[in-house]
A protein has these predicted regions:
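Aromatic- and charge-enriched surface segment that lines or borders ligand/interaction sites
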Residues: 84-127, 141, 147-149, 235-238, ...
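Structural transition elements
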Residues: 195, 285, 292, 313, ...
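N-terminal lobe/hinge region of extracytoplasmic solute-binding protein
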Residues: 37-90, 121, 190-191
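A structural "hinge/loop" feature
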Residues: 41-59, 82-83, 109, 157-167, ...
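Detector for C-terminal structural segments
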Residues: 31-38, 201, 270, 274-275, ...
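Surface-exposed binding/hinge segments that line
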Residues: 98, 130-176
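Ligand-site clamp/hinge motif
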Residues: 100, 122, 183, 211-257, ...
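Gly/Pro-rich hinge or "lid" segments in bacterial periplasmic/extracellular proteins
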Residues: 63, 73-77, 164-219, 223, ...
Length: 512
């Protein structure tokens, strides 16, 4: 072949290789199934982003069915998702989001700024009051751009809007929701997430299938089945028999059994999940809990380290605050020692030398071990309480409606910072707050508009100091999440601070 021919052939080969390299990759068709055995019972309210009550649990299903403008992902706490970018004006009053083009919901509807505005305006979960108080207007610039105009600078707008502190930025299809209504949407949710809804059998299972049109990457696993199996021992047996691939929420001996079983893997994560006891009657002058000495006695009656070591195999962290220590603006309080002798002395000083009947301690049944540890500690110093376990969705509803008396075991893994946790659980009128104190409320209002970081941090630290000084709560533990993974699963993706295995589109099965 001539030199000219060789050069022509070489150029042709380079062109072909360039075309191949630039051509869109066709993802392999999704196949196989992964079954989850959950330690909770799923509720339809968690299929709708509008109703997330300041806790992390609903994101278990939201990450499958839906998508947000911005959300935590592996290696990025604020990953651009349905929004490919956003900007803030110099005066801090306007946030503008540019939507990703070509995104479709599971029913084929194209996602536009109208859906974003609609989703925000129907949002009624945790943080909704803050949005209503601080957002002046939501403006549709065009189909791909939406603008949030604030009444005054709000340093936490993105923390509230773009993290799992709330789910206000998770988008639903406006036309579909208007057609089927809120109840119809819960029965047959349509989202823009990596998996589409197939079926839900209350108390039994949720089934979802891969959505090939997902913008980020089509899932590799075709079907996910989330089974509700609240009993720890049953989940362990299922995992050992291969009846489930991933079993969540193990504790103590069962977690140790998973760790020692060949072929199984014990996955340990440290999410921002803290647990504590609420003294709902501390604002009632007729209640023993109105006396700070009684609340402090309850704190000294709990052996946090012994519980954490036993239940979480040493991975949990005893807590002295309801705010996780990894949160921005966290103030480090002194640790509560385990001191039952001092607790009895405080009770005697408060007029209860023989203790008192404290009524019920309400709890999500999933966290009965924590609640039993608290009750045993309280009984040891003369505070007699009875356990009242409820299924999780019922517990959340009753707690949000402030229906409980006496004591409540509360927990939250919602992301955010110290301000988002305080907004939901501490200030007067918080979505899950049973009362508040004027001094704390005033400090919270001040910090919400303080743009100087150091001054804002000082305000939030002062709030936390007052919470500690008044013994408003009895913190228990920052829990570890111990998950059993079976031999068929190749990859279990992790999002920092997130208790669940996600994003689901990154799950992989081992090659057969």
């Amino acid at each position: 072949m001539s030199r000219r021919g060789l050069l022509a052939s070489a150029r042709a080969l380079v062109l072909i290789l360039a075309l191949v390299a630039s051509a869109p990759r066709v993802a392999a068709a999704a196949e196989g199934q992964i079954t989850f055995a959950l330690n909770i019972t799923l509720a339809p309210t968690w299929f709708d982003p509008a109703e997330t009550p300041g806790v992390i649990t609903p994101f278990l299903t939201l990450y499958a069915l839906h998508d947000g403008l911005v959300k935590p992902m592996p290696g990025n706490a604020w990953a651009p998702s349905l929004a490919e970018s956003w900007t803030m004006s110099k005066d801090g009053l306007v946030y503008e989001f540019v939507l990703r083009r070509g995104v479709r919901f599971h029913n084929g509807d194209v996602l536009t700024a109208e859906d974003v505005k609609f989703s925000f305006e129907r949002y009624r979960g945790g943080g909704a009051a803050s949005f209503k108080a601080r957002v002046a207007a939501v403006e549709i610039v065009d189909a791909q751009r939406i603008r949030f105009r604030l009444k005054q600078p709000w340093p936490d707008f993105m923390t509230f809007y773009a993290s799992p502190a709330t789910s206000a930025a998770w988008i639903v299809p406006k036309k579909y929701v208007e057609r089927v209504g809120d109840d119809g949407f819960k029965k047959a949710p349509i989202g823009a997430g990596p998996y589409r809804f197939v079926s839900f059998t209350p108390g039994i299972e949720l089934v979802v299938e891969a959505f090939d049109g997902y913008w980020r990457t089509p899932p590799s696993v075709k079907r996910l089945v989330f089974k509700s199996v609240p009993d720890d021992s049953t989940r362990l047996v299922m995992l050992k028999r291969g009846e489930t691939d991933i079993a969540a929420g193990f504790r103590g001996p069962n977690a140790e059994d998973v760790r020692r079983t060949p072929g199984l893997t014990l996955r340990v994560t440290l999410p921002t999940v803290s647990q504590w006891v609420v003294f709902t009657e501390q604002w009632d002058p007729k209640s023993p809990w109105a006396d700070r000495r009684v609340r402090l006695a309850a704190n000294l009656a709990i052996d946090r380290k012994a519980f954490s070591d036993a239940e979480f195999l040493g991975h949990g962290r005893p807590a002295s605050s309801i705010i996780p220590r990894d949160f921005e603006f966290y103030w480090t309080p002194p640790e509560y020692p385990y001191d039952p002798g001092r607790a009895r002395q405080l009770l005697a000083e408060a007029g209860y030398p023989k203790g008192f009947d404290a009524g019920e301690l309400a709890t999500d049944v999933t966290f009965a071990p924590e609640s039993e540890a608290v009750i045993n500690g309280l009984r040891g110093v003369g505070i007699r309480a009875r356990l009242r376990p409820l299924e999780r969705a019922s517990f959340y509803k009753a707690d949000q409606d402030k229906q409980f008396k006496n004591l409540v075991r509360v927990g939250s893994g919602a992301a955010g910072n110290a301000a988002t946790r305080i907004e939901a659980f501490v200030i007067s009128g918080g979505i899950r707050s049973y009362g508040g104190y004027p001094e704390i409320d005033a400090l919270f209002r001040d910090q919400a508009v303080e743009m100087d970081r150091k001054r804002r941090e000082a305000l939030l630290h002062r709030i936390q100091q007052l919470m500690y000084e008044r013994a408003m709560f009895a913190p228990i533990v920052e829990q570890a999440v111990l998950t059993g993974v079976g031999p068929r699963v190749a990859e279990t993706p992790t999002i920092t601070g997130h208790p669940f295995i996600s994003p689901y589109e990154d799950l992989r099965l081992k090659a057969r």
